[in-house]
Amino acid sequence: MIQKNTLLEVADNSGARAVLCIGLLGGRKSASIGDTVIVSTKSITPRGKVEKGKVYRAVVVRVKSPIRKSDGSVIRFSSNAVVLINDQGEPLGTRVFGPVKKLSSGSFMKIMSLAVEVL
């Protein structure tokens, strides 16, 4: 579960390495896979598309807490990760690194198509 002040990895090539969750959309206290959060960039790569300290939207694609699937199996990722998106819900990067759990919302189909592995 992702809360405010959670440090997250960025799973795309937008130029950000680490972001800090500063808000959750929908009036919730915690976010899970597929939820949209407001983040601030903490560390960036040179010549990236994002700037340090700027505020962006992101969708959660991996969480460390175990997730139970409908068939009874449990998925647990090694890190919390997000993909940065613009206001229209399209990813800022052109690649998504690492596995991604299937996002239930139809608005993030582009992220699932860019991912290397969808669980």
Curated annotation (Swiss-Prot):
HAMAP family with a match to the protein in the record? Ribosomal_uL14
GO MF assignments: large ribosomal subunit rRNA binding; structural constituent of ribosome
Instruction: Return the InterPro entries for the record.
Output: Ribosomal_uL14, Ribosomal_uL14_bac-type, Ribosomal_uL14_CS, Ribosomal_uL14_sf
Taxonomic classification, please? Bacteria, Pseudomonadati, Pseudomonadota, Alphaproteobacteria, Rickettsiales
Question: What are the alphabetically sorted keywords of the record?
Answer: Ribonucleoprotein, Ribosomal protein, RNA-binding, rRNA-binding
**Free-text function comment from the UniProt entry:** Binds to 23S rRNA. Forms part of two intersubunit bridges in the 70S ribosome.
What's the family? Belongs to the universal ribosomal protein uL14 family.
**Coiled coil regions, renumbered to chain:** none
| Species the sequence originates in | Wolbachia sp. subsp. Drosophila simulans (strain wRi)
Which cysteine pairs make disulfide bonds?
Answer: none
Q: How does it assemble?
A: Part of the 50S ribosomal subunit. Forms a cluster with proteins L3 and L19. In the 70S ribosome, L14 and L19 interact and together make contacts with the 16S rRNA in bridges B5 and B8.
What's the name of its gene? Answer: rplN
Query: What protein is this chain from?
Result: Large ribosomal subunit protein uL14
One cellular component term from this protein's GO annotations in UniProt: cytosolic large ribosomal subunit
Write out the GO biological process terms: translation
